[in-house]
């Protein structure tokens, strides 16, 4: 992050703009809206500045840049068409430890001005860090179309109710649940937009009188195979509403960065052959936190119901009467194969696909005879340590030794690596790959040479 987004309280604080043209006028308008005590220093001024000065809204200082004007300032903007003057303003501000924006020169500035969506008191700022102002403007226009004009009225009304909410609801969890009901109430929003005070009061009283659901809940969310762009919209909504997120090592840092900032995070990383936290203890963590009335998200790589032990976790909650729901995710087989250019089914090569765990319970055995059948694709999860056995068993039960195989490491991420060969090489290839990795076996693997789009590795 090259710039820290902040919102400045400038009301009744001295600010300086150097420049008297159209660009300076746009900056001045923003500072005046923010309530700043504004001084504008320039050789000449466009008429709007004179209008503002005559109305007592700002002070004009005609002449060359006078750096003593910075002595009482909190913030400065250099908006002339002379790069040398702009640099002088920046240097003078820097020497006084005053933040200075230099128009169209982000490297010379100590702060930049974002594109703004104003639904006061709700403000949304969009910035490209000065690298692409046009992109920031396009995003702002998109957001403008998505955010209702009356959103500011809703936010302002919420501010009026804060003391009452704090008095009526004792815990942060209760208050958050109330506000969630408040902000999704379309009738209230429309009544505020229509200035229908009677309807606003009636809806408000109904919201305060309705009992809150004090029970906690658990939501199993599939995070997908790695690329944060593959997280579903519903999954994103859930992790941004969570009180606590219980996650494993297959959840990428990019996805964890999307979690609500003040949510508690509990790492229960697991991998085949090693469990940081035993499964039964994970079950109890989910149960214990939900019984405290918290909204718990169990965030799992891939899909929670495909070799994710999600069913076991939900059984514990079901027996305890804890409400739960499931948000599916893109499973590793689908994501990794797509990002490797390997279609799992193809009318010429595979009429079915089998998802198989390579990590069996002690004494377990797979149906190797059916797995070795023709015209299908096999995808082994957690199979690296068993790769040599998989190779041996499939050949022993009749699969052709030259059957194409691929191993996908860190699938769908920028670190994705794919090694491929034939079945007789599977055990050897597995030595070149680190977990997390997926094994794909089938004629469709040969299509990778033509269909690989994501990586040349």
Swiss-Prot record:
Residues 216-448 are annotated as: Uroporphyrinogen-III C-methyltransferase. SUPFAM superfamilies: NAD(P)-binding Rossmann-fold domains (SSF51735), Siroheme synthase middle domains-like (SSF75615), Tetrapyrrole methylase (SSF53790). Changing residue 250 to A: Abolishes the dehydrogenase and ferrochelatase activities and reduces 6-fold the methyltransferase activity. The active site is at residues 248, 270. Keywords: Cobalamin biosynthesis, Lyase, Methyltransferase, Multifunctional enzyme, NAD, Oxidoreductase, Phosphoprotein, Porphyrin biosynthesis, S-adenosyl-L-methionine, Transferase. Pathway: Cofactor biosynthesis; adenosylcobalamin biosynthesis; precorrin-2 from uroporphyrinogen III: step 1/1; Cofactor biosynthesis; adenosylcobalamin biosynthesis; sirohydrochlorin from precorrin-2: step 1/1; Porphyrin-containing compound metabolism; siroheme biosynthesis; precorrin-2 from uroporphyrinogen III: step 1/1; Porphyrin-containing compound metabolism; siroheme biosynthesis; siroheme from sirohydrochlorin: step 1/1. It comes from the Bacteria. It holds the Pfam family CysG_dimeriser. Changing residue 270 to I: Abolishes the methyltransferase, dehydrogenase and ferrochelatase activities. It catalyses: uroporphyrinogen III + 2 S-adenosyl-L-methionine = precorrin-2 + 2 S-adenosyl-L-homocysteine + H(+); precorrin-2 + NAD(+) = sirohydrochlorin + NADH + 2 H(+); siroheme + 2 H(+) = sirohydrochlorin + Fe(2+). Changing residue 385 to A: Abolishes the dehydrogenase and ferrochelatase activities and reduces 10-fold the methyltransferase activity. Residues 4-202 are annotated as: Precorrin-2 dehydrogenase /sirohydrochlorin ferrochelatase. One of its GO terms (biological process) is methylation. Changing residue 128 to A: Abolishes the methyltransferase activity and increases 3 and 4-fold the dehydrogenase and ferrochelatase activities, respectively. The keyword Transferase applies. NAD(+) binds at residues 22-23, 43-44. Its EC number is 2.1.1.107, 1.3.1.76, 4.99.1.4. The keyword Transport does not apply. The modification Phosphoserine is found at residue 128. InterPro entries: 4pyrrol_Mease, 4pyrrol_Methylase_sf, 4pyrrole_Mease_sub1, 4pyrrole_Mease_sub2, CobA/CysG_C, NAD(P)-bd_dom_sf, Siro_Cobalamin_biosynth, Sirohaem_synt_dimer_dom_sf. CDD domains: SUMT. Homodimer. In the N-terminal section; belongs to the precorrin-2 dehydrogenase / sirohydrochlorin ferrochelatase family. Then it catalyzes the NAD-dependent ring dehydrogenation of precorrin-2 to yield sirohydrochlorin. Finally, it catalyzes the ferrochelation of sirohydrochlorin to yield siroheme. This is Siroheme synthase. It comes from Salmonella typhimurium (strain LT2 / SGSC1412 / ATCC 700720). The gene is cysG.
